[in-house]
Every structure is written in C-alpha cells, then in structure tokens.
C-alpha cells in the first residue's frame, strides 16, 4: 500500500509461499501473502496478530540487518559530542515530518524547555521549501514551542555527515524511525525511542536492543522526555556514547549479516517444511 508497491503481483501468487516485511510496517490485507516478517520485540509471541492477515514470522533478534557500507563509502568513527565544544545540546530529527504528531511535538517542546539553550534540528523534505518551513514553525508555535530554537534543514544527499552536528536524536512515535535510527547510531549519535504496542511503534526498541543500547528505550511519554533530558545533562555519558557507539554498532547484532542470514534462512526452512506438510 506504499508507493510503487508490488501488491498486484503478490495477488497473483507467483510463489507458493509469500512474505511481506521490512519497509512496510502494516498488514497487506491480502490472503495471498502468508507471512509478515517481524521479531520478538516488534511483535512478541504473547501478542495476537493485531489485525494482520499474515501469520507473524518472528526472528529471535531484530528482523532488520543494517549494512550501510554496502551502499555508501562513508565510514563512521567515534568523535566528541558537539555539545562539548558548543556548550549547548543539539537535538535532532531526520525522519519524515509526516511521522511527527502533535503529541510528539509537545514532548520535544518540553525537552527543549528543560535543557537550557538547547536547539532542535529538523531535517526533512518538507523543509526544502519556505512554505514547508513556515508550516513547521507555526505548528510548533501553536503547541507552545519557541520556533526560534528550531533549525530547519532541507533534505540533502550528505545527510549522514550532518549527524556530526547532532548530540541526541529524538525518535518519532507511534511511527518509529527505521533506517534513520540505524544511520544515527552508526554515526555515533544516541537515539531516544518510545516503545509502543504495535509493530511499527516498537521498531525503534528492536533496533536499539540489537545495537546494544536498550537503556535508550522509553516505555511511556514521561520516560521519553526524562531520558532525553537526563542524557542531555550528563555530558560524560553523552560524550562516551558519541565516541563508542560507532564501533559498538558495527560489532552488534544490528550489523551481524552472517548471524542475521542464519536466522532468516532457518525461518525460511521452517515455513517451507510446513508448506510441504500441508501441501
């Protein structure tokens, strides 16, 4: 149901067993799609199917494997947090602004008000035009925020290097970031994510767990705000994360291509065996 999808092809069932997953976080609604790829954090076994027509195909670890170096030449290295030199904390969000709810903007407002002199960089396609930037500023102002603390940046191909300007990334909810969260961690920037009750709202928790930083997961809005403020005020911890995260992420489950493929292929074997038994 997203742009340029292949649902008409899937509806013709070109394969005897069909799976949807990664990139699209909801059900297809097609009975021809048998499974939905997920994991034990995004869709725990204790949960029901939650409206999915597909059977959950759960991997024991994150159902996403992040392999940026196969697509980009940039290499991440540890560095000091920007706040160490600037003297103030810069929060950031590089997600699509369509994911930013009023409820989340209010939390960002509260975080900025609790951290003196802090700024928020919002980088997205809508900020590529003056009318889009004005909409963002007016919306933030309507919710009680000070638009002067916002730095609005347009989408650009060098977005990875721009993480070097960010101290802490604030994830969106209930539609979490996926690739943007991975990118931030890879570039050494901690991400505060809120765990919800659906696959799409638990994506951030799955990624952060796989990256080895589950302490950055918040279970409610108050904790989300609290974790962001506490980290912003703990310069030693913030700087340590910036210096150590790149190597930690490269050695984590999130980027373990071999381990990921072993788990995925085992899942394939199980559902194929089941198909053959039922065939």
What does each model-found stretch correspond to?
Residues 6, 156-159, 181, 204:
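Acidic, amphipathic alpha-helical patches
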Residues 5-9, 107-110, 180-183:
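A short acidic, amphipathic alpha-helical/loop segment
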Residues 1-19, 23-27, 218-219, 223, ...:
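Repeat-solenoid scaffold signature
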Residues 95-97, 110, 123-143, 226-279:
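C-terminal amphipathic helix plus adjacent low-complexity
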């Amino acid at each position: 149901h997203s742009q340029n999808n292949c649902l008409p092809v899937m509806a013709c069932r070109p394969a005897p067993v069909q799976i949807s997953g990664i990139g699209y976080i909801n059900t297809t609604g097609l009975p021809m799609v048998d499974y939905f790829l997920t994991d034990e954090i995004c869709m725990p076994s204790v949960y029901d199917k939650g409206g999915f027509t597909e059977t959950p195909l759960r991997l024991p670890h994150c159902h996403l494997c992040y392999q940026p170096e196969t697509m980009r030449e940039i290499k991440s290295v540890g560095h000091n947090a920007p706040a160490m030199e600037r003297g103030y904390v810069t929060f950031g969000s590089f997600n699509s602004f369509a994911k930013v709810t009023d409820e989340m903007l209010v939390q960002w407002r509260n975080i900025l008000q609790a951290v003196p002199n802090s700024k928020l960089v919002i980088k997205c396609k809508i900020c590529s035009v003056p009318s889009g930037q004005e909409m963002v500023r007016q919306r933030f102002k309507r919710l009680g925020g000070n638009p002067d603390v916002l730095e609005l940046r347009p989408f650009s191909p060098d977005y990875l290097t721009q993480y070097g300007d960010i101290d802490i990334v604030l994830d969106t909810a209930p539609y979490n970031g996926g690739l943007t969260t991975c990118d931030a961690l890879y570039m050494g920037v901690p991400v505060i994510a809120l765990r919800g009750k659906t696959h799409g709202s638990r994506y951030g928790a799955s990624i952060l767990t796989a990256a080895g930083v589950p302490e950055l997961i918040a279970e409610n809005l108050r904790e989300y705000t609290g974790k962001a403020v506490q980290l912003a005020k703990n310069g030693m911890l913030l700087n340590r994360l910036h210096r150590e995260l790149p190597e930690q992420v490269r050695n984590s489950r999130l980027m373990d291509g071999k381990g990921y493929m072993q788990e995925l292929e085992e899942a394939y074997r199980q559902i194929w065996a089941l198909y053959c038994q039922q065939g």
